[in-house]
């Protein structure tokens, strides 16, 4: 039970992952494999702290080659989703909108005050409270660091740092501890991975055998019939920021991101655009931060704001990433209900099926030949978690055929 470090399949390395040996400078790595007799090809990661031990072959280790390996799925999702904090903020006037002190992180924090339920109030994943937080801004963007909330043109997007609100949106980690139980409709198809996260469908492409750490990320609105639902590419070259993953002593996968490459792309774009002037140097490097390319497709969302005197203002040039653009609403209550409907698990599943053109199918047509990582049907983790398995028949907690226990408890087989 308590053995660790003696076996290659300990909690710290449940998949017997090969590891790199890192020099003290952090930039000279050679592959090591205790069972290997031949020379292994070196895997090079730059800018890694010397005390980190990344996997020598992270794409292979986290590629779901064995699609029924729940431990591997957990490692990947914990490492990936653990670095994506998102915030859901309520709309309203200054006196009615959520302040930082109002942001509740769990259902128990809310006590009986449902009006401050600003996280899972807008959506659950397979019946579980969704700990995601996605900060929302309405109407005016974050120009000058003080955008106002209106309910006439709502949109969900990433927060722009106060100190650099004219450049890009960033997510600073570590965020909430995402687990596979928070994710639905997880499927692997060819060289891509897709899963449902709240009201979004997140897809990772070309990650099975990426080139030098390539990781293509894209976020799509679930309503494919709505012209306002646009695909968003997370950073122009996300692989320029990735520096490697490793398994820590608790059995969790952690990742290092260096934003200099992404910043360079955005600085180049900024130099070519008259509406943006900030460079990446305005943001301090953070080993676990992930920058996002500014979206400029919603031109109408960046129209000049109008002051109380009626004169136009051209200060509304701050970049603002639209993830989901709900229908126009006229009141806070209507917006709240719209967001609840948008992120409702049943709505999400319906829209997923619609987006793949199979309204009456239990699984998207293009995914019918794939095998979801959890369970044997269309990825409804709720029944698996309850012990019913994919078919929902059995009642024992071990009957689902998939081990969903935390990674820390992996015993080595």
Curated annotation (Swiss-Prot):
**Lineage, please?**
Bacteria, Bacillati, Mycoplasmatota, Mycoplasmoidales, Mycoplasmoidaceae
**Compositional bias (Polar residues):** 1-13, 25-54, 355-376
What is the protein name given in its UniProt record? Putative adhesin P1-like protein MPN_144
Q: Gly residues bias located where?
A: 385-399
Coiled coil (residue ranges): none
Its domain of life reads Bacteria
Region of interest (Disordered), ranges: 1-60, 355-413
Source species of the chain: Mycoplasma pneumoniae (strain ATCC 29342 / M129 / Subtype 1) (Mycoplasmoides pneumoniae)
Q: Which InterPro entries match?
A: Adhesin_P1_C
Which pairs of Cys residues are joined through disulfide bonds in the record?
A: none
Fetch the Pfam families from UniProt. Answer: Adhesin_P1_C
By sequence similarity, the record places it as follows: Belongs to the adhesin P1 family.
